[in-house]
């Protein structure tokens, strides 16, 4: 059984996270879990963030059950050096099966899902719903001349793409993102993890960063206030590279100070994972 979830912090050195109830909700329906595995190449970080679907029954149970069911498979696969794509999809299926077993007369609990496997050379992200993964580059690129059009975000970007009505409207060419987000139905998700979603196959993206940075997983309680990767990078850096808990705490506080209209979860994973990284404070 989980402990009090109104405010949770955890720091493993190579990864840290904060999950908070926010200002408006009576309980925290988000959940996070992460671990560090070791294989022949060095430490591998695995992490999951889930946001229980409030319109379904027992959303707090759904998110917690999903992260608990998925993290063991992620950690075991990473430690054995298994294909991270297959490991990620297997974890999603295990979480989906666990949620199927939660279904009852009151309906089918459901949750979003975003997970990561972060090794020394590669990052694998899997997702369903609108919980997000961002790559935040360590420093912005610098233009070399007045006419240079170099991307000054330095490669910071959103890795995941929401399974939401807003994204579908934009993809269909029916509206701009700003116009789509103005709709009261913008945040309606179109795919999720639960017994009533017949196709739980997650999206997967793999990439190899060219330099240092952090992978951030978060629920919409944060990105509703700062959706752009470059802005998030400017807020998180440089603390996120060596003090991930400080960065996660700062971003969670920012979301709370901005209104805290939803539950807030932020997980920060510096890349590449360092074997000498230690928690900011002794574990409880």
What does each model-identified segment do?
Residues 1-284:
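PP2C/PPM-type serine/threonine phosphatase catalytic domain
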């Amino acid at each position: 059984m989980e402990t009090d979830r109104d405010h949770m912090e955890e720091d493993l050195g190579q990864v840290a996270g904060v999950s908070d109830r926010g200002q408006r909700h009576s309980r925290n329906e988000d959940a996070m879990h992460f671990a560090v595995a070791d294989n022949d190449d060095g430490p591998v970080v695995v992490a999951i963030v889930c946001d229980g679907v409030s319109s379904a029954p027992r959303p707090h149970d759904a998110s917690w059950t999903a992260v608990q069911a998925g993290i063991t498979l992620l950690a075991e696969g990473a430690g054995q050096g298994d294909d991270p794509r297959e490991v990620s999809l297997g974890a999603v299926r295990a979480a989906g099966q666990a949620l199927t077993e939660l279904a009852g007369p009151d309906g089918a609990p459901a949750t979003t899902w975003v997970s990561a496997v972060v090794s020394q050379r590669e990052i694998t992200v899997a997702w369903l719903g609108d919980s997000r993964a961002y790559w935040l580059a360590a420093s912005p690129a610098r233009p070399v001349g007045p006419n240079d059009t170099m991307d000054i975000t330095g490669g910071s970007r959103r890795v995941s793409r929401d399974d939401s009505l807003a994204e579908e409207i934009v993809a269909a060419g029916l509206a701009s993102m700003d116009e789509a987000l103005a709709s009261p139905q913008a945040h309606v998700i179109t795919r999720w993890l639960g017994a009533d979603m017949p196709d739980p196959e997650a999206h997967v993206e793999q990439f190899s960063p060219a330099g240092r940075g952090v992978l951030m997983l978060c629920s919409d309680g944060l990105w509703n206030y700062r959706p752009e990767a470059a802005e998030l990078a400017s807020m998180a850096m440089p603390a996120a590279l060596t003090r991930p808990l400080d960065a996660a705490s700062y971003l969670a506080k920012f979301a709370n100070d901005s209104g805290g209209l939803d539950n807030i979860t932020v997980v920060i994973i510096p890349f590449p994972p360092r074997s000498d990284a230690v928690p900011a404070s002794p574990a409880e």
